[in-house]
């Protein structure tokens, strides 16, 4: 007799050409991912060949009840690591029935920036270091922490191994492999400084695809933690006190920065970021003031700074200085930042904006 797991793992390709497409979108809070599935007559690899769909925006905080229809536009396709076969995950953005982007659709304006000739010519690359914290479902307390208590001080947990130092590795490894299967350019994972906190990296990715990949990687992580009965939080400072917060350091380069003499281009770009520090901070994630305190490997939120290999700076430059070209790392974005907003804003400030 078949058990539930057997049915969940049924291979549809043996009996039908039809596939399941899971449409994913961002809800009204700007961080809540939503999804629903539909049957399609056969495999699809081009998002422009996928049908648009709709949903009840009044149930996601994105439309009033008397005019609640929101339209999903498919934008990027990934292989589905949960259903496998020819089934797909579809990253969408959201529009009114008249075709106008709704206010929470940050992808639309990001895509306009990335498709502008000036930005496209520079082919901006991104590597995003997404930190997150795993919480016990019933207590909302970090995984591996004693209920109502605290583990030993930070030090042994970063990239640590062992049952007393590493909590949730099965979830992390499942997520790593699922992202690779899906076609996300996930480039690594590691345990973080605070116990129960982890990081995965996505990139290098070009332009708008960086945001698509980070959002779908987040979606896959939330689905895996759902299966595991664990809660994932992207809060930038989940535990107050002498514990590291969670960020989404954004590594960035342009064609000009990657060429000989690129270090001068990088320094000019950093100067532009300094001039627009307040605007960037306002767009870099909610609650970031709890994280950017000048302690725990962060810069103070009110002061812009940069340096070579300086983990306490707003922007860090590594081997780039010695090589004379390369990339830099914007360390200000919080773990709950919108990658569409952050990536496009960095490109706009450093390539398009004139002081």
UniProtKB/Swiss-Prot annotation:
Plays a role in the flow of nitrogen into nitrogenous organic compounds. Coiled coil: none annotated. Residues 19-99 form the GS beta-grasp domain. SUPFAM superfamilies: Glutamine synthetase, N-terminal domain, Glutamine synthetase/guanido kinase. Homooctamer. Its main location: cytoplasm. Belongs to the glutamine synthetase family. Found in all the tissues examined with higher expression found in tissues of the root, stem and seedling shoot. One of its GO terms (biological process) is glutamine biosynthetic process. This is Glutamine synthetase root isozyme 4. The gene is GLN5. Its EC number is 6.3.1.2. It is found in: Cytoplasm. Residues 37-66 are annotated as: Disordered. It catalyses: L-glutamate + NH4(+) + ATP = L-glutamine + ADP + phosphate + H(+). It is an enzyme of class 6 (ligase). Keywords: ATP-binding, Cytoplasm, Ligase, Nucleotide-binding. GO terms for molecular function: ATP binding; glutamine synthetase activity. The keyword Nucleotide-binding applies. Residues 106-355 form the GS catalytic domain. One of its GO terms (cellular component) is cytoplasm.
